[in-house]
Amino acid sequence: MTNFNVMLAHPVGKKEFDKDSFIQPKLDGVRCYITYHGAFSRNHKRFMNVQHILDELRPLFNKYPHVVLDGELYNHDYKDNFNKIISLVRKQLPSDADIEEAKAIQFHNYDIFMPDTPDNSFEYRNESIKNLHKEFTLQYCKTVETYQVQNDVTARLMYYQFTNKQGYEGAILRNNKPYEQKRSYNLQKYKEFHDTEATIIGWVEGQGKRTGTIGKFLARDADGNEFGMPVMDKMPVLTKMYDIAEWYIGKTATFTYFQRTPSGSYRHPLFKSIRNYE
């Protein structure tokens, strides 16, 4: 199975999660599914620099050729350096040195899909993952800690444990439902963002269906870092913003972001508003 579509999460809040759901830490890695045929991104691009992972999974896939392992290419030692993970796993023509360095990357396996029994609950799938890791000797493939939660209070306590104590970027809530090859409310993500200000110095037009609208603002923060902040809103609003884009130059914008990068830039910046309300 090489055309597999991974299950994607909605943000927590729009729909309540079920009682007796499961919670896992949210990893800041590169989404990856692995089959008998290789390792692939969520958009089906083959990863060419994870041969150490594929080699140790070969006995597993020889015995269970139809299963799909879902997870992330990650190493918690790089939890504050997402760009390092990217640089290691996305090389298409890796040198011997690249291959050796990439052995720092692990596959963190948090779900599994079995085409012959597609209606398996998450509880069953999670037990299957644990059993596979007992059956086979796996050094580079890791299970992801998983806990059952009965209510929102328990979920928030686990979120605090994952983020404040262990340094993960958030948490994932999973209803005890079958795997869905689409974005689903049976998979929800907790993730906190920060906000700050920067001066707008330019803009970029949207592409495709967003041609003729504002795509993102270019900005400079107080430390002189220049970056782009995408703009998300309804199409009429984005069109109006594009029509008066020149007006925004020099204005102070509030934007949200997840965290700072080692180089001082921003992870996931997003325009929020013009700070002209005080």
Question: Model regions: which residues?
Answer:
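Covalent nucleotidyltransferase
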Residues: K14-L138, Y277
